């Protein structure tokens, strides 16, 4: 895990800066210090949890086992409840979307973890590859040295999808409780694989999304 100091930062992106309805308006948020996983939870990590607890394996795994060569790839096709159960087992929790965004961009309002301009080859997105990659395979780290916070796999957060203060959400959202997912995947374009783009995915039920994984956070002991 890597340490993220507490700070006030400007969350979201205004329309004049290219923000869409999900991202705007930009607003001030304060987060307390925390630790965040340097990498997304891998198939290898998740398999230990499945073996120890008897929790169901992702439906994409054959006979409860991940495919050959996938040990260091992010675990995907997990529901929000699956991700939450893993986090609890690991003595951690899922990040709020405020924590996730701050860990991805820091205090200077950057659009990508490395700066404001897209740079090909720093993240697994925008046509870089046609498949998910091992964690840490790309060097586009955040100000706090976390890897893969844009591209590769979407990431669950603890937060419900809600409009930002003074904003609104598009009217075509699926029904049910939606949890915020962040970061985009290897199939995302550079417009969506950003530190600010957000969307929601149903939290409950057996439906999974094969490009969504997660990472965990841990509170700093006081």
Predicted segment positions?
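Short, compositionally biased
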Residues: 1-56, 80-81, 211-222
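Short, surface-exposed beta-strand/loop micro-motifs that present aromatic residues
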Residues: 27-28, 37, 143-145, 205
């Amino acid at each position: 895990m890597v340490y993220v100091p507490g700070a006030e930062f400007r969350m979201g992106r205004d329309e004049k800066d290219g923000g869409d309805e999900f991202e705007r308006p930009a607003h001030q948020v304060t987060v307390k210090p925390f630790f965040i996983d340097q990498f997304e939870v891998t198939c290898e990590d998740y398999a230990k949890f499945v073996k120890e607890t008897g929790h169901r394996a992702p439906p994409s795994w054959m006979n409860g086992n991940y495919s050959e060569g996938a040990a260091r790839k992010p675990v995907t096709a997990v529901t929000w409840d699956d991700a939450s159960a893993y986090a609890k087992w690991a003595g951690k929790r899922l990040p709020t979307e405020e924590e996730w965004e701050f860990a991805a961009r820091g205090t200077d309002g950057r659009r990508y973890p490395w700066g404001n301009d897209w740079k090909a080859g720093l993240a697994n997105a925008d046509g870089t590859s046609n498949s998910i990659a091992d964690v840490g395979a790309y060097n586009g780290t955040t100000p706090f040295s976390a890897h893969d916070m844009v591209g590769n796999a979407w990431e669950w957060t603890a937060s419900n999808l809600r409009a930002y203060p003074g904003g609104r959400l598009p009217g075509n959202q699926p029904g049910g409780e939606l949890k915020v997912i962040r970061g985009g995947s290897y199939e995302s374009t550079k417009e969506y694989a950003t530190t600010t783009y957000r969307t929601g995915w149903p939290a409950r039920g057996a439906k999974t999304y094969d490009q969504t994984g997660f990472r965990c956070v841990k509170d700093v002991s006081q």
